[in-house]
Amino acid sequence: MKIAVIGAGISGNYAAYKLSKNHEVTVFEKRERLGGHSATIDVDYDGQQIAVDTGFIVYNELNYPGLTRLFAELDVETNQSNMSFAFSSAYNIKSGGLEWSGDSMDTIFAQRMNLFRPSFWMMLKEILRFNKIANYGDLSTDASESLGNWLKRHKFSESFKNNYLIPMGAAIWSTPSKAMNDFPAKSFLNFFINHKLTYQDRPVWRTVKGGSREYVKKLVAKTSADFKVNSEVTKVTRRDAKVQVYINNENVFETFDAVIFAAHTNQTLSLLNDADAQEQKILSDIKYLPNQVYLHRDRRLMPKREKVWSAWNYLHDKDEKNNIIVTVSYWMNRLQNINKKYPLFVTLNPPEPPASELTFGYFEYDHPQFDRNAFAAQSNLSSIQGNRNSWFCGAWAGFGFHEDGLQSAQRIVTDIESRDYVETIANAS
């Protein structure tokens, strides 16, 4: 078959990598580079050249089995990483606030005042209680129950909720704290359990040596697919068992036997002027939220106490309407084993940008937002796969991570290959 793939992130690239062995595959990417969230930036840091990831950064072999196999196939070199977590509401004030990190007893009580805070001790006690419930308790909660309601029902304190669990979830999914309260509790708990976030013995995290772009290069080199960058798909029309793909607002199109939409749900919907009611419902129920991302060296956007600095740093702040602002600073030195002589941070949604003279780059990444409607849409996704020779994939079909994007594409590859096999047998009989 002649197959069009729209989007060159993990889902589109993986689908092309697998399907190009038996099909003629063309990948359309609107940007000038391939990789999607696999975005490595070259930084000139006082004359030192450093490659830094700004999107996909880490994985582990337990929860990313497909990606692990792919890296083995491509002979991708990786290094051990770190996934420590810190909380700070003191980073931008002269005194007070709260800071702690889970690295050790010393970092938990790096702010010595925590030793004398009953609410802090209560939070630590409730972390243990939460882990016990998650690991051994009854998780038969209604799939529609929100995390906020679940925490209230189990009588967890505001300190535990606001200084630990909600910030961690907000950091993981790049989601506002308020939205985390609406996150389905059952899905949240299952994610924590599957990723062993409730265990002492956690999986070893790894990062791609030289940056995530290195695996993208190797994947593209090992496929016969035709990758077209700077080729923005502006419309897709499906008729007469064929698919017409329009590029760069030109009134010309290429014709294919099938199309794989490996883009964000809202992007896919914008291309389809003939989406049926089911496609419209499923794709519109999985929404995206834009995030502002800065690559910089401004220490003001890290916890005040350097002892607390962790791989992931949740910075708690509020806007003028008293709404909580989700700001996360990734300490890239710890995540990518970069010499600490060159402090580098990737910060999402800071209340104020880092100093311009300390900034290496600004980017915008959209992340899927998960609620009851989103998970319901995922469960119905198979009902539209293959209809009118169209398939849909992306990290949005899982929990929003690299492995989810790969597995989503793998399901489509399996579906297309099985249909192709059945058709071959039918034609031969």
Predicted regions and their residues:
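N-terminal Rossmann-like FAD-binding beta1-loop-alpha1 element of flavoenzymes
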Residues: K2-V27
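Conserved Rossmann-like nucleotide-cofactor binding loop
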Residues: S11, R33, N266
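Glycine-rich FAD pyrophosphate-binding loop
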Residues: S20-D44
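N-terminal glycine-rich dinucleotide-binding loop that anchors FAD/FMN and/or NAD(P) in oxidoreductases
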Residues: I41-L67
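Conserved flavin/dinucleotide-binding core of flavoenzymes
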Residues: D42, D103, N322-S429
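Mobile amphipathic helical/loop "lid" adjacent to a hydrophobic cofactor/ligand pocket
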Residues: E61-D182
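Helical element adjacent to the flavin cofactor pocket in flavoenzyme catalytic cores
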Residues: F188-Y246
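Mid-domain catalytic core of redox enzymes
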Residues: E232-D366
